[in-house]
Structure formats: structure tokens, C-alpha cells
Curated annotation (Swiss-Prot):
GO terms for biological process: carotenoid biosynthetic process. One of its GO terms (molecular function) is squalene synthase [NAD(P)H] activity. The gene is crtB. Pathway: Carotenoid biosynthesis; phytoene biosynthesis; all-trans-phytoene from geranylgeranyl diphosphate: step 1/1. The keyword Transferase applies. Keywords: Carotenoid biosynthesis, Multifunctional enzyme, Transferase. The keyword Kinase does not apply. SUPFAM superfamilies: Terpenoid synthases. This is Phytoene synthase.
């Protein structure tokens, strides 16, 4: 679906409604769990999130899609130029019309988008990470940025100024928590996709962590599941869950109409870690996923948490 044009003008005119519908279809097709969460949002916010998701997906496809072998640093530079065009109000592709409209409705900053492109540059130049600090930077760029983009759309809760003790209270903007949720999701993706990435010669788990458990790159590339691997995965899952816990702390600061979908998305994605454990950490031969019935059961619990937490 990704098309890069050197033309400064959109080749195929699209209406806003058509563009948003295209973004909806792409989100529903490629991010089923995420899409379920967006269905709980007010219309304007869900449309904006679809537009952001599609841009992020197209960006990711540059280095992780069917045409990735032809992507160069120059390709990413050109993609960033197209981003600047979109922020200037000039869409290039039909799906960009929705993003341009979103930029007019919500206070989105261009920097997280640029940071995401920087994350794709990292993917072009390396396939190993020595330390968690290195991996954490990568996770911020490719996923923590999504938290920041989404936060601008979701909005924050305003204190009830009719209550005297709230009159001096400032609005809390849960930036760190939004980043934490993006990082938690990316760490979950990495753990779920270890086998798939290994088949492409990529290892995202920090090499320092592998060494800590006496587990080698060769072991990972060969899909070796033993007690060393299980201990390593327990360590990684515990780390990811800490980021989810941090993210939870910011949900109460969000606008009330967005808390239920955010709780839903967080809880559903975190359950992937439970499924990895249920599969006895074999991410080489089994892809962890949350069954539909579990997703449905999650909805009322997420709604309850949104109301009381």
C-alpha cells in the first residue's frame, strides 16, 4: 500500500470521509486488537487515531514491509520531506487527507513523527542491541512516539473548578505514562515476534541480557527453548509489565471519554504476555495471541477500571 511520490501534489484527490474510511479499513485489517479499542472512542478521536496509525504503519513498512530491501536512508529523508508537506497542509497520498484534517483538529506536534522516522533509520543500520538503554531508545522512537501522538488526540481531564480545593490545581499531562505504554507495547511485540525476527537475522533482545542468562545468539537463532531461555523470557516479561504499570498511572489524567478504550487497549495487549507464558515461552514455534472470547471478557473489566481508577 505504501507509495512514495516525488510530486508535491496529491495525484488522486480524496474527500475527507473517503480518506478516513480508507484509514479505518487499513486499521481494522492490520491491527485487530488496536482497532477494537478505537471502536470505544468518540467518532472524531477514533478517526484521528486511525489516521495516525496508518501513517505509522506506512512508516514501519519502509523498513519492515515487502519493499524494505529497496529502502535507503535517502528514502527515509524523502519520507520526512513528505511528512513536512503533510504538516504544511499538503497531502501527497489519499490517506494523507485524513491526517491533514486530523492536524487541523488536534494539537499534534511534528517531533514525535520525526522521532519515529529516526527509529526506522536505526532499523536500517543495525540488527542487534547491546544494552537495554539502546533498545529503550529504539522502542521510544518506534512506539513511545505513538503514545505522544495519541495523547494529543485523547486529551486530558480538567479539574472541576466549582470545587474550591481544585481551583489552584493545574492540568496534569501524562507524557511519561503515554511513552511508557508505547514502549510496553513494543517490548511485547518484540517478545511475541522473537522467532519471526530471528528468521530475518534480527535480535532485539539486549545482548547483555542474553549473556546474563548464559544464552547465546546462536541459541536464539536456532530457536533453543530450555531453562536458560525461560528465565531470560521471565526477566523480559517482568520488565515489560513494569512499563504497563507505569502507563496505568496516567490513565486517570486522560479525558473521561477516552479512559475505557485506553484501559481496553492496555489490558488486551498486556494479555499477550500471559499467552507467551501459557505457551511456555516458545515464541519460536507458536505465535502468542489473545482469543476473541478473552477480548470480549476484557471489555467490562476495562470499563469498570475506567470508572473507578
Amino acid at each position: 500500500m505504501l507509495q512514495l511520490s516525488k510530486s508535491p501534489c496529491m495525484r488522486t484527490p480524496a474527500t475527507r470521509s473517503d480518506s478516513y474510511e480508507l484509514c479505518r479499513q487499513i486499521t481494522a485489517q492490520y491491527a485487530k486488537t488496536f482497532y477494537l479499542g478505537t471502536q470505544l472512542m468518540p467518532l472524531a478521536k477514533r478517526q484521528a487515531i486511525w489516521a495516525i496509525y496508518v501513517w505509522c504503519r506506512r512508516t514501519d513498512e519502509l523498513v519492515d514491509g515487502p519493499m524494505a530491501s529497496s529502502t535507503t536512508l535517502e528514502t527515509l529523508d524523502h519520507w520526512e520531506e513528505q511528512l513536512e508537506s503533510i504538516f504544511a497542509g499538503h497531502p501527497i497520498e489519499p490517506v494523507d487527507v485524513a491526517l491533514v484534517d486530523t492536524l487541523g483538529r488536534f494539537p499534534l506536534d511534528i517531533q514525535p513523527f520525526r522521532d519515529m522516522i529516526a527509529g526506522q533509520r536505526m532499523d536500517l543500520s543495525r540488527n542487534r542491541y547491546n544494552t537495554f538503554d539502546e533498545l529503550n531508545l529504539y522502542c521510544y522512537r518506534v512506539a513511545g512516539t505513538v503514545g505522544l501522538m495519541s495523547l494529543a488526540v485523547m486529551g486530558t481531564a480538567e479539574p472541576d473548578l466549582s470545587v474550591p480545593w481544585n481551583r489552584d490545581q493545574s492540568i496534569y499531562y501524562p507524557k511519561e505514562e503515554a511513552i511508557a505504554l508505547g514502549i510496553a507495547n513494543q517490548l511485547t511485540n518484540i517478545l511475541r515476534d522473537v522467532g519471526e525476527d530471528a528468521r530475518r537475522g534480527r535480535i532485539y533482545l539486549p545482548l547483555d541480557d542474553l549473556a546474563l542468562f548464559n544464552y547465546t545468539e546462536a541459541d536464539l537463532l536456532n530457536g533453543k527453548v530450555d531453562e536458560r531461555w525461560r528465565e531470560l523470557m521471565r526477566f523480559q516479561i517482568q520488565r515489560a509489565r513494569k512499563f504497563y504499570t507505569l502507563a496505568e498511572e496516567g490513565i486517570a489524567a486522560l479525558h473521561p471519554d477516552i479512559r475505557w478504550p485506553v484501559w481496553t487497549a492496555l489490558m488486551l495487549y498486556r494479555q499477550i504476555l500471559d499467552e507467551i507464558e501459557r505457551n511456555e515461552y516458545d515464541v519460536f514455534n507458536q505465535r502468542a495471541y489473545v482469543p476473541t472470547w478473552k477480548k470480549m471478557m476484557c471489555l467490562p473489566l476495562a470499563q469498570l477500571r475506567a470508572r473507578v481508577l
